[in-house]
Each structure stands twice: as structure tokens, then as C-alpha cells.
Amino acid sequence: MSANVQVSGQLSSGPSLPACIVLSAVSLLCFVAGFGTGAEFVRFLSFGAIFRNISGGLDGEIPLTWSEAIRNTQFQCCIGIDIGLLFLFVLQHSLMAWTAVKKNVLHVFGVLQRSIYILCTALSLQVLMRFWQPCPHGPYLWNVSSDPWSAWLPLLCALVHTISWLLIFSVLLIFDYAELMGIKQVYYFCLGMGDPLSHKSPRVARLYAHLRHPIYLELLLILWAVPCLPPDRLILAIFFTLYLSLVHRLDVQDYAYLRSQLEKKFLLFSREEASAVGGQIRKNN
């Protein structure tokens, strides 16, 4: 069975049952890999950074000064490895999103193109997390260790991170999570319905093309809202902040569309609320 099938917006007869089973299995495996890696990435960015910090530093340790750290060979090696890992992730994530590369991947894998992208992203994130080099003895940009902030600030950061992750998951669900993870493409293909994006309006398709990272502000809060900021976390935060700023490409038309949709949702909610209140009043009378 070959997955070398081009995705079109036209309705067509679906593939054979064995082909659908194989495609579905591969798509689900890629989804599981992506979902599991995403859950581990939450732990990597939040849990360790708040309650144990990403560098694993211990209370009472005296970190190096910046001048000492720059001359420290171990510190230089750790920072060099971390920067290399970040460049590797960005290279994979950006290269596979390039139009020419996407066309080649689509030519080879067909409807599994998005699933393969998710799998490769998961693998690059796993490499980043597995080989990340902490700098527990490096100079901290800030480190809250005095009472009462040493007790309250981690809790406050935990609250900010929890709300941010909940918002991220909510936005991903709103932005068609199944299509984003490559499952919907296989489902539609097996039903002979073509590309899921072809069934959406041009304005929605345009918005999706510009907003594959609909989590900009929330991720910035997660990256920077930590009780202490060691050098490795600082590099991680700066790198992802710059990358997210470059790929965040909403324009005036996208904002206008989002505003119109929010106004429609609010109007619909207001009508439903008024109808419910009116029905309750009539029932009481």
C-alpha cells in the first residue's frame, strides 16, 4: 500500500479498507507520539522550573558570577550544547513548514504529510529535552530565595502556568485539534472527502495558515514567569520568544475576522441567555 496520494478538495471514492487501517494506525501512532511529547514538554517547561527549577539547583548554593561563568569550560560547554539543540529544533520545525519541503513530503507520504510533521516535531523535542544541559552553578538573572517570597512566588508562578496551559489547550481545541495533529486528514481521506481545509471558508483557511501557533502570549508567560532564571532557562526563554515573534504572522484581515467571530459568538450567547431568562419568567407566571 502506498501513501503517495495527493489530497484534494474534491469528493472521491475512498481507499480500500486495508489501506484505511494502515493509514489510521500510522496517524494514531504519530498522534500518540505528539501528544505524549507535548505532555512531557509541559513538565519540562513548568514543573521543574517552578518547584525544582529547570537547572536542578539546590537551595543555598552560591552561583558563579558572569565573569567567572564566561571563563568556565563546563559552563561554556553546557550553553553551547543547549544553543545547538535549540537551533536543531527550529531548523526541523521551520524547514518542514517550508512550502517546497511540504510539497515533497506530500508527494512521498500523501495524506500522512501532517502526521509525519507531528512525528518529526515530537522527535526533535525529545532530543531537546533528553540532551538539555542544565547550568545549576551559573549566574542567575534573578533568584527569589528570601521569605516570604520564596514560598509565595512559586505558588503564584504555578497558578500563572496552570491558567496559561489551560488557555493553550482550549485554543488548540477551538482551532481544530484533530486537523492540527493530522488525524482529520486521514479520516476525511478514508471517507473520500479530500482535504479538511477545503471544507472551510477562505477566511478560516487564511487564518489557519497564519496562525499555526495560536498560543503566543501564553507561552511567553510560561517561559518567563519562573521564581529563578538560570542561564539555560534564560537562553530557552529568549530563543523561543524570538522564534514565536517571527512566526506570529497575523495581519489586519485576520484580526478583523477574529473580532467579527467573537462578536457573533457573544451575540448568540446573549440571545440564548435572554431566551432562557424569558422562558423561566413565563414558566413562573
From Swiss-Prot:
Nuclear-side positions: 1-16, 97-113, 181-207, 251-285
Q: One GO term of the cellular component aspect? A: nuclear envelope
What keywords is this UniProt entry annotated with?
A: Membrane, Nucleus, Transmembrane, Transmembrane helix
In the bilayer, the protein is annotated as: Multi-pass membrane protein
Q: Enumerate the transmembrane spans.
A: 17-44, 75-96, 114-130, 150-180, 208-226, 233-250
Which cellular compartments is it found in?
Nucleus inner membrane
Cystine connections: none
Main location group? nucleus
Q: On the Perinuclear space side, which residues?
A: 45-74, 131-149, 227-232
Ribonucleoprotein as a keyword? no
Identify its protein family: Belongs to the nurim family.
Protein name (record): Nurim
